[in-house]
A protein has these predicted regions:
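Long, low-complexity or tandemly repetitive, helically biased scaffold regions used
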Residues: 1-76
């Protein structure tokens, strides 16, 4: 791989890692807030929707982890 492309990817990966750190903080805060809600709210339709949104954010974070790993493997 051209050195210029490796440098571009490294810069992009730094940005993705920073984004993921922020995303993971949001996920943690949202999950803690959800966990502190009453069990009846958690089991309600709104509670289930809220947990689903948290799960979607976690899935996005997991996908970012995989993308970062794949990119690092590609430039090794």
């Amino acid at each position: 791989m051209k050195q210029k492309n490796v440098e571009t990817l490294n810069t992009m990966l730094q940005g993705l890692e920073a984004f993921q750190m922020i995303l993971d903080k949001v996920i943690q805060e949202e999950q803690e807030a959800f966990d502190n809600l009453s069990e009846s709210y958690q089991n309600s339709e709104k509670g289930e929707e809220r947990q689903e949104r948290i799960d979607l954010l976690q899935e996005a974070s997991d996908n970012i982890t995989e993308a970062i790993s794949n990119c690092y493997s590609a430039i090794e």
